[in-house]
């Protein structure tokens, strides 16, 4: 998880390459493939012979509307084509099934809820969470990296519970 607009991209790139080099045999990366941090990490994972599974926060056609630049959308599609598996998180049950209304709050569920559900999925099914962000949790946005960090903290606090699985380590 991380910022869409990455500062210090060269440092983030180097730290991610070091992470994958030190991680032992290739494994699986789960990623939303959003522009910025997600795409950077997915590219490095693929270069490191890891499998990448795309976990999309909503149906593909709707998710593609969130890419603000043509180059980012093209990069997303190229990465998606290299993914081992693609999972689309279903729309929250309170969202009108007319996909065009997902951006409008309806019964308390918004587009941000779909990103929050992506964060929950990643925290539940990931053992190590990589966070590429500024570290500011003072004003978490729904579904943003700060909220994902708080979800990770809650999961780590429960890690001694045999019923709890998911994140066991967070790297910032």
Label for each model-derived stretch:
Residues 1-172:
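Acidic/glycine-enriched connector segments
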